[in-house]
Amino acid sequence: MSPESWKDQLSLVSADDYRIMGRNRIPNAVTKLSGLETDDPNGGAWVTKPKRIVVSNQLPLRAHRDISSNKWCFEFDNDSLYLQLKDGFPPETEVVYVGSLNADVLPSEQEDVSQFLLEKFQCVPTFLPSDLLNKYYHGFCKHYLWPIFHYLLPMTQAQGSLFDRSNWRAYTTVNKIFADKIFEVLNPDDDYVWIHDYHLMILPTFLRNRFHRIKLGIFLHSPFPSSEIYRTLPVRDEILKGFLNCDLVGFHTFDYARHFLSCCSRMLGLDYESKRGYIGLEYFGRTVSIKILPVGIHMGQIESIKASEKTAEKVKRLRERFKGNIVMLGVDDLDMFKGISLKFWAMGQLLEQNEELRGKVVLVQITNPARSSGKDVQDVEKQINLIADEINSKFGRPGGYKPIVFINGPVSTLDKVAYYAISECVVVNAVRDGMNLVPYKYTVTRQGSPALDAALGFGEDDVRKSVIIVSEFIGCSPSLSGAIRVNPWNIDAVTNAMSSAMTMSDKEKNLRHQKHHKYISSHNVAYWARSYDQDLQRACKDHYNKRFWGVGFGLFFKVVALDPNFRRLCGETIVPAYRRSSSRLILLDYDGTMMDQDTLDKRPSDDLISLLNRLCDDPSNLVFIVSGRGKDPLSKWFDSCPNLGISAEHGYFTRWNSNSPWETSELPADLSWKKIAKPVMNHYMEATDGSFIEEKESAMVWHHQEADHSFGSWQAKELLDHLESVLTNEPVVVKRGQHIVEVKPQGVSKGKVVEHLIATMRNTKGKRPDFLLCIGDDRSDEDMFDSIVKHQDVSSIGLEEVFACTVGQKPSKAKYYLDDTPSVIKMLEWLASASDGSKHEQQKKQSKFTFQQPMGQCRKKA
């Protein structure tokens, strides 16, 4: 039964916060949306249409109160990405927005406002009280998460706030409020939910808890830090598991995705794989897909502004104002990561080193209002003003020339487009940024329009040109292959880039411009949204092909996805099949299957030896231990089981019974690769306390079960990567198992053991097995299960007589499971008892026949 972890989450919310969440503060949305349901043409009552629910911290709305009527007025914010992405959805798709309003609506007005916004704008507002909003947004999001996700640890108060448990509770509370509002408009069987950004990273856990099959994606618009930075978060696991409760996780760049995958590997022990261009994380039977795609801009919006006469008039005024100057442009938010001061210093150095540029080059810096308040913002603003004043006083000239024109405050999109139009170069040198679309907007503007061309005096012989100087630490950098990439911390490099932009030929500028414009125009916001939406649909298509079970409490909740036919192996199922068969093959893993993983003494007990002998004494049985262990310990441990077969080192060595010799795999015995692998493993053994190396005849294994769990898993992943790199040209495979990293020859696997044994039984006995039991517990045993499914000889056995069984209720290729090692032993006892009973019945019949039929009469009858 699924644990009720939803209720347990209230323990993370204080009593005061919970009272804030009362109905009088958060009105319900109307649950039936216009256009959401239609008449069924086949006579049914209603047919639901799948809709997209776009969830973000703020709704794509502008709000103000009309002074004369004292009523609220709302309009869509055309600059909002969340509104623009609608263009990427299929036609006639219902889109519902869930988020906060950038307005303080009185509690008495909230119900009416909610109703109005839902009916007129398809928006569901989450009204957050000011004290809760302050702790959630300013306290946790902007002053704690934002710096860390931009690689800045809170070493001092000026570098961000320390972790505050009350702010974390506020973050949790707000995410819970968002979940409640989503539930009011959600059809969990059909709708797709798309969550945006770091403000709502634990929201997926609340949603997945309530509806296990919800179709859910998240896109992170900020950077994702390296694991060394991220692991400092006291709530790192809760946030990671929030991401993993999604079906699709999106990032702007591969670097951000790589850091996320590294965190999942090092902190949660999860592995990922790339198949046919898709990256997926296996998480308790679910595949969490990873999407890497930078967002684009809304081409139509920029084109319409370019065509406006108002824009042309603004361009004319700016052109007159900066007549005779070469204009470079910067457009940035006011925060500590945008590198504005570094840009100004580079500008000062450019003028210091190039006297001929003084009086000619102007850097126009537009600074958008800060999204948060605090001493850090004030310090940044103060520093920028001081540097600008210093450079202007040093290089300014009488008549009004100032090398730095600092525009600090809100600037309309129209005015920004006008500045883009007159600028020869745009400089974006943030020290860390999620995406930054300024270069995109600049490039599209520089492509021109009839109105802009007339305002700029653009002639028929003139060529389109633009130059972009971009920091290598921002999301758009990989997409702009023609940009001049710089390290913003290297002032000399930024200065040289500015100088190159001034001296670059028009032909070169045109080539770079055309290259960028082609990419930007084809990878717009609609393309981005459409691609994400299609991948989200693909990631969710198997939801109803599996059974989902809820596991865990609070923010550690997850679902386990299992095959619908996956079930516990019961005696009522296997014993009758065992009794009616005459040629049986029984394959048993050892560690974790018949011997508990946590047991220090791995030798089999006398009871286990006795049990195996009972099974082996049945002439209808062929019983094999199939293990990754070496042949010497297995041979020694099971010496008292004369009829037991052993396949050691994953099948490299095979022995049919204690009297038969060891057979070796037919693969070439080239073990020279050990000279390469051993020093690497030794290095990791010395660096990882508690780890050790096991050297087999055909393989080498690095064990870390006695090391620190987190560090051991981390080192295992690093060792795996290292060995795969140095052994690329060797005939081996490198695999991770349960607390191990193993190197073994190619073509050796437990799956090959299954094929070999069945083929041998067919060739020697003239018949295939009519009963097959295979039990294992880890990744290497999945090869056996896979071989059972695929091997053509096995497919001829009736499905009811094939029993592939894993240990533990977990995702597996096996059809059955047993809970633990004692359950395995108990099941084998059932089979042994069935064999004992058959033998007893046979002896009883034989004894009865001899007593009733004297030998002479038998001969006579014969």
Curated annotation (Swiss-Prot):
Give the Phosphoserine positions (modified residues). 5
Region Glycosyltransferase, residue ranges? 50-538
Please give the superkingdom of this protein's source.
Eukaryota
Task: List keywords of the entry alphabetically.
Answer: Glycosyltransferase, Phosphoprotein, Transferase
GO CC annotation terms, alphabetical? mitochondrion
Protein's name in the database: Probable alpha,alpha-trehalose-phosphate synthase [UDP-forming] 11
Provide the family line. In the N-terminal section; belongs to the glycosyltransferase 20 family.
Q: In which tissues is it expressed?
A: Expressed in leaves, roots, stems and flowers.
Q: What is its EC number?
A: 2.4.1.15
Which top EC class is named for this enzyme in its record?
transferase
- Is Electron transport included in the keywords of this UniProt record? no
Task: Give the Pfam families listed for this entry.
Answer: Glyco_transf_20, Trehalose_PPase
**What's its catalytic activity?**
D-glucose 6-phosphate + UDP-alpha-D-glucose = alpha,alpha-trehalose 6-phosphate + UDP + H(+)
The alphabetized list of GO BP terms reads: trehalose biosynthetic process
Chain segments carrying region Disordered? 838-862
Xref: InterPro entries: Glyco_trans_20, HAD-like_sf, HAD-SF_hydro_IIB, HAD_sf, Trehalose_PPase
Question: Sorted alphabetically, which SUPFAM superfamilies does this protein's record hold?
Answer: HAD-like (SSF56784), UDP-Glycosyltransferase/glycogen phosphorylase (SSF53756)
